[in-house]
């Protein structure tokens, strides 16, 4: 007789996970395992970048630092920096009102510099024919007294004369040199002659690549910081073995110090109000540092260092495990785009904890779960390699630093913002589509592995067992634990059990045939009896109708 308890089932792992992922076909699919690839957290601090401290300018601007605003004395000499931090509206900018020519270009230059060495190129004491210490202003106070920018000299007439200046500096250093100078624009003609004696003045500056001639613009202006005059500052990069030549008969703000560019590298000027956090990171944003190996983040579009790519997404989760459908859940699930093919199995097994796919058997010796280690390990390796490949491809060093534009370049700035927004939209779309597609493929990959395991068992057992349609096989022979193990490891001996299985199949077939014969006899008897009863009823009705005249009966011979 058939031993119905001898069964083997193919199934998959389930657990108590509530992790959910999205696919092309479905949203919020619960899976056994998942990996978040979107970093959403930061520490809210400014940190060292790979062990190098940032240059945090506090209340000073880049212009205030480079020119030497008296309120920025703490930055007279600064060590190597990894990046520069400037507040959105620093208080200590150009203390004497005016402009810094090509300021945005200078900031762009600084984004590729990691260290300056300040050197004296024209000593203040060398201006014997001009007043080099009288050029101060109440707009630039220091310790309650009028002062001026530390790194340039405002030259004033001496003894009612302002002799024409002709000075040169030859860059004998091996490094490029950042040189700054300026011009003073008086409020009126009286101020012009009061300071410089000469009513008509000029400043000429020349290098191998620069040819500049400046004249003061005398005009009545509103007061800023108590000053109606204005100052305009300029800069150039002086190459090694090149010379810079100055000529002027008034209004000249001469360089005293210049900056030797001793180290170039990746840097940035970051706008942030944060304080230094005495920490280290590989990726810094204006919102805080990110320490993550994830390929994407949604913290801030501007970054410096080895950073994930910024996307506008709120959620990017990769499926690494299977659909989490414990066996107690009987409702039907939708299947995937690529033909998810393990739908014949009603649910996963929470009792199988040592693998993704495996078996459950039951026989006279008992029952139990066993994972298929080989298929599980291959699947783990495949999914892990895929996830790592995605992360490696996306997690390359990526910097996005802000660009600054002056008031005349607003249209360019707007166009630049639109282009950057467009790039971010494309990155976001690509990242989200990548996750949806890979999640679909991963879940279908798991379904395919379950189906392959099922087919492996089916091809071994052939007609020695019956497919029950729910992922299980019912043996036509007794299958002890040794037999069950042979099915699992692929060494099942079909001929050994085929005779016993054949006899049990025939016994089952005989029972079915005997039952079918009995049903046929009963059916024939029932049909004949019903027909005979109907004939008798019709004959009786006819005789009754003939006897009372309702029906005429004629017999013709």
Curated annotation (Swiss-Prot):
Glycan attachment points: 15-16, 28, 159, 170, 291, 489
Sequence ranges on the Cytoplasmic membrane side: 542-557
Disulphide bridges: 9-472, 47-279, 60-72, 95-140, 283-307, 479-483
Feature type site, description Cleavage: 335-336
Protein task: Binds to sialic acid-containing receptors on the cell surface, bringing about the attachment of the virus particle to the cell. This attachment induces virion internalization either through clathrin-dependent endocytosis or through clathrin- and caveolin-independent pathway. Plays a major role in the determination of host range restriction and virulence. Class I viral fusion protein. Responsible for penetration of the virus into the cell cytoplasm by mediating the fusion of the membrane of the endocytosed virus particle with the endosomal membrane.
Note: Major glycoprotein, comprises over 80% of the envelope proteins present in virus particle. The extent of infection into host organism is determined by HA. Influenza viruses bud from the apical surface of polarized epithelial cells (e.g. bronchial epithelial cells) into lumen of lungs and are therefore usually pneumotropic. The reason is that HA is cleaved by tryptase clara which is restricted to lungs. However, HAs of H5 and H7 pantropic avian viruses subtypes can be cleaved by furin and subtilisin-type enzymes, allowing the virus to grow in other organs than lungs.
Record-given protein name: Hemagglutinin
Name of the encoding gene: HA
């Amino acid at each position: 007789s058939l031993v119905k308890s001898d069964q083997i089932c193919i199934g998959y792992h389930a657990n108590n996970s509530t992790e959910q992922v999205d696919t092309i076909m479905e949203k919020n699919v619960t899976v056994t395992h998942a990996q978040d690839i979107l970093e959403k957290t930061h520490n809210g601090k400014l940190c060292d970048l790979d062990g190098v401290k940032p240059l945090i300018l506090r209340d000073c601007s880049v212009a205030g630092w480079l020119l030497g605003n008296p309120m920025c004395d703490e930055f007279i000499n600064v060590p190597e920096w990894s990046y520069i931090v400037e507040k959105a509206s620093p208080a200590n900018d150009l203390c004497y009102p005016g402009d810094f020519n090509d300021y945005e270009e200078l900031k762009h230059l600084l984004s590729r510099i990691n260290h300056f060495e300040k050197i004296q190129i024209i000593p203040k004491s060398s201006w014997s024919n001009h007043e080099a210490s009288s050029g101060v202003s109440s707009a630039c106070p220091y310790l309650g007294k009028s002062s001026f920018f530390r790194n340039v000299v405002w030259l004033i007439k001496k003894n009612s004369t302002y002799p024409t200046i002709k000075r040169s500096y030859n860059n004998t250093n091996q490094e490029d040199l950042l040189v700054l100078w300026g011009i003073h624009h008086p409020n009126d003609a009286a101020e012009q002659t009061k300071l410089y004696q000469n009513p008509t003045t000029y400043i000429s500056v020349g290098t191998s690549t620069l040819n500049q001639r400046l004249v003061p613009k005398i005009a009545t202006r509103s007061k800023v910081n108590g000053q109606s005059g204005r100052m305009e500052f300029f800069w150039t990069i002086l190459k090694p073995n090149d010379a810079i030549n100055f000529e002027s008969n008034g209004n000249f703000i001469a360089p005293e110090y210049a900056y030797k560019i001793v180290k170039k590298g990746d840097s940035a000027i970051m706008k942030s109000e944060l304080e230094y956090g005495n920490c280290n990171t590989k990726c810094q944003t204006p919102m805080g540092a990110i320490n993550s190996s994830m390929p994407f983040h949604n913290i801030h579009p501007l970054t410096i260092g080895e950073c994930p790519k910024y996307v506008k997404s709120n959620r990017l989760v990769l499926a690494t495990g299977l659909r989490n459908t414990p066996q107690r859940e009987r409702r039907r699930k939708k299947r995937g785009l690529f033909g998810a093919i393990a739908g014949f199995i009603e649910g996963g097994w929470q009792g199988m904890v040592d693998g993704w796919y495996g078996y459950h058997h039951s026989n006279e010796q008992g029952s139990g779960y066993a994972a298929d280690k080989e298929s599980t390990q291959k699947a783990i390796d495949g999914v892990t390699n895929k996830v790592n490949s995605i992360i490696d491809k996306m997690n390359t060093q990526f910097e996005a630093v802000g660009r600054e534009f002056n008031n005349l370049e607003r249209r360019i700035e707007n166009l630049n913002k639109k282009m950057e927004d467009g790039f971010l939209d494309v990155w976001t779309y690509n990242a989200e589509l990548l996750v949806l597609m890979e999640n679909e493929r991963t879940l279908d990959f798991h379904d395919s592995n379950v189906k392959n395991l099922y087919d492996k068992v089916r091809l071994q057992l052939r007609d020695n067992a019956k497919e029950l349609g729910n992922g299980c096989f019912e043996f036509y022979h007794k299958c002890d634990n040794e037999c069950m193990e042979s099915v699992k490891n692929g060494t099942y001996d079909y001929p050994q059990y085929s005779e016993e299985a054949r006899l049990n199949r025939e016994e089952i077939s005989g029972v079915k045939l005997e039952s079918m014969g009995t049903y046929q006899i009963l059916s024939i008897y029932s049909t004949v009896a019903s027909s005979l009863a109907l004939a008798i009823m019709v004959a009786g009705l006819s005789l009754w109708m003939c006897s009372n005249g309702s029906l005429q009966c004629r017999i013709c011979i």
